[in-house]
Structures are given as C-alpha cells and as structure tokens.
Amino acid sequence: MYNNNNNFGGGGYNQGGGYNSGGYNNNGGGYNNNNGGYNNNNNNNGGYNNNRPQQQQQQQQQYVNNNNNSFDNNGYGGDDDVTNNSDYQSTTRNIQQIQNAVQILTKLVQLLGTPKDSMDTREKIRNCVDSTTHLISSESGKVKNLTSLASRSRDSKNKLLYQKLVKEFNNCLQQFKDIAQVATKKEKTTPLPVAPDHQQPTTFGRNNNSNNNNQNNHFLNNQQPYYDDDNREDEHQSLMESSRRQQLAQIEAEREYQNSIIQERDEGIRKIEQSIVEINEIFVDLSGLVAEQGVMINTIEASLESTTINTKEGVNHLREASKNQKSSRNKMCWIVLILLIVCAVLGVILFFTLRK
C-alpha cells in the first residue's frame, strides 16, 4: 500500500513516499485503510483523534452478506431486486405450500362423518396438520426477518413488496388455523369409523358360534340310546360354557379395539389442538408486526399516489409553461420585428430628410 508522511515544522516541508503493507498512512490529518477497515487518525497538536474499529466494519459487512446483499451496512436498501433475497424466495414458495395444504385439508375434513370416512382419512388429516405446522414454525423466523428488512429499506417499492408478502403469509396462517379448528370439532362430534378388517372376524366368529351350536345340538340329538340323560346334560352344559367363553373373549377383544381407537382419536385431536395453539402464537406475533407496518404501508401507498398525482400535475404545468414560453417567445419575436421595421422606416425617413 501507499505510505505518505507529511511533516510541517519550522517553516519547512518534508514529503516522504514509500510503500507500507499496513495501508495508506498520512500523519497530520491523514487516512489509514487496513484490510477493509476504516481508521481515521487526526493528530495535530491539540486536534482530535477519531478511531473506528475494524471489527465494527466487519460485523456490518457480515450482516449484509447474511441478508443476501439486499441492504448495505447501514441497514438500508442496496439491491433494487428484492426477489433475489433468499428469505423472500423461501417465503414465497412456502406460502404456496401452505395454500395447497389448506386445500387438501379442506377436502379431507369434508369426508368426516360420511361413508368415505375412515381411520386412514383421519390419519391423513393429522399428518397434514403436523407437517404444515412444522413448515410454518420454521418459516416464521424468516418472515420476521423480512419485516425487519422492510422497516429498514429506504426504497418504497421494496418496502411494499416485503410487507405485502408478510401480510399474505399471515393470511395463510389464519386460513390454516380455521380449517384445523374445524377438523378438531368434527373429529370430536362424528362417530368413529369401524375398520372393515375388524368387522369380518367378529361376524365370522358369530357365524362359527351359531354353526357350532347347531352341530352340537345335532350331535346331542343323534346320540346312542345307551347314554343316559345326566351325561347328555353335562355335555350340553360344557358345550354351552365353551361357547359363552368364546363370546366373552370376542366382546373383550371388541372393547379393547374400541378403546384403542378412542385413544388414537384423542391423541390425534390433542396433537391438532397443540398445533393450533402453536400457530395461534405465531399468528398473534406476526399480526402485531403487520399492524405496526400497516400504517406505514398505507402511508407509503398514499405517498405514492400523491407523488403520482403531483407528477402528473407537474407535467401539465411544464406543458403549460412550455406553451407560455413559446407564446412569449413568439410575441417577443414579433415585437422585435416590428421595432426593426419601425427603425428601418425611421432610418429611411431620416436619410431622405438629411439629404434634402
């Protein structure tokens, strides 16, 4: 780097030029630039010394890089195209995903309580709510960052783009929260669907019991005469007791199955309610930011409209001024021409008068 030392004293002047890897150094009101940092040293026997640390400059530059060069180190707009911002692009994509999830969830909720209702349908509802909630939670930090960038931007267009995107994201949250609440309410009020693969064994078991009873009765009725009535009665009671135990076992299995279904439903409803609470917290947080920026949006839009109107009025005034200027120019030309003609006539008259 360039090193220039200027020393003033005793009426003399001394200039030394050289190269210094530390940067450009000018003592007595000079400038020192070290590795991208800015250091201004003014020391002139009673002057002042202003040192700005290099670390502060590096931190500010790192902040700029983290925000995709959309804003300079003072936090104001440095990139005209806000769509190049990574958070802006990510939020735009995820808004579309949330809207798709709302449509899918709406169709699934409409199936609850209908013949097409099934445990698989309810499982899809829970998975959709859970995955979308995670998406919203991970995206909320980026949306807050966009709100912060919008408040720092000096460009009115950039500010509007950021704030409208945040508002659109908040609207998607409201729609998703509403349909999730509807899903919870319908799951609580509609009866549980019975799985077809569970109905079949029960019916089959009952048919088997009926067939067994018929076979047993037929067997008892066709016994040989040498069996006495007591033995026949004991065997009949034994068969009836066996059939009763099978029925009790089937009833107990049915009860356990229903309990497991109820527990699964309650667990799914609880998860959906937790997701609603989480989404509501994010919604309230972002709503406050949107409300704070809403006045600014209206002010900016009003300012843009006022600027447009003023610009049109200014153009009209310029046109009128241009017309007036041309008219004045024409009038001046005519006046000058008339004066020249008058002067020429007077000159001719004066010429002939003097000749006489």
UniProtKB/Swiss-Prot annotation:
Molecular function per GO: SNAP receptor activity; SNARE binding
InterPro entries: SNARE, Syntaxin, Syntaxin/epimorphin_CS, Syntaxin_N, T_SNARE_dom
Gene Ontology cellular component annotations, sorted alphabetically: endocytic vesicle membrane; endomembrane system; endosome; endosome membrane; SNARE complex
UniProt topological domain (Vesicular) ranges: 355-356
Protein name: Syntaxin-7A
Gene field: syn7A
SMART domains: t_SNARE (SM00397)
GO biological process entries: endosome to lysosome transport; hypotonic response; intracellular protein transport; vesicle docking; vesicle fusion; vesicle-mediated transport
